[in-house]
Amino acid sequence: MKISMRRTLCVFGAMVALSAPSAAAEEPAVIRYCHGFGCKLSTTVRFSSVDMTELKSIVRAGRSSAEAEREALGRADQWYERLAGAASGTSTDKAKGGFGEVYDASQLDCIDESRNTTTFLKLIEKRGWLSHHTVGKPKVRGFILDLRYPHNTATVIEKETGEAWVIDSWIPANAEFPDIMPLKIWKKKGVLGRN
């Protein structure tokens, strides 16, 4: 009787373990990815459930502080550009969008980059994965007469301080870590093309 009872408990325990809910899989996502300068072209980028689970892990690794979250958003942007680059043929996007290569569909200007990064950040925000920031509107600096070419960037706003931070993925090449700094510092940069 003891053996039969043990066997029954083991079988019952195994059934409970197998029927226990696993971690909820993340819903897939689809976003529009701009390229070809001025969002002239766009490619649909699809993120599978596995992709979204990986992205959540990258972003949530930064939940300990605002600084850690910005670092995690930089890593998430790199991850995003690798996937989007493969899907859109822009994985060879050069630093500063191959400045001067206006008709090259594999390159992105700062308008493409700021729209893409903002769209991506809004996806993260909509999923509820941001602890310390909200997504801001894209910002611009320069207007030629101040010796700076016009340049756009994505932004996030730190919840605790209200300070705006840029996540500028146009400066580096595809899938390299973006420039992340306070908006007030970014606004002063870019004179004569220097960053």
Segments (PLM) and residue ranges:
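Extracytoplasmic/periplasmic, Sec-exported soluble proteins
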Residues: 47, 65-72, 102-113, 146
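Sec/Tat signal peptide C-region and signal peptidase I cleavage site
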Residues: 20-26
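Glycine-rich catalytic cores of cysteine/serine-nucleophile enzymes that process amide/ester linkages
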Residues: 28-49, 147, 165-194
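Bacterial N-terminal signal peptides that target proteins for export
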Residues: 1-10
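Mid-length scaffold segments of soluble, non-membrane domains
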Residues: 75-133
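Hydrophobic/aromatic-rich core segments of domains that either
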Residues: 122-186
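Bacterial N-terminal signal peptides
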Residues: 10-19
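Acidic/histidine-rich, surface-exposed loop or edge segments in extracytoplasmic proteins
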Residues: 35-67, 93-103
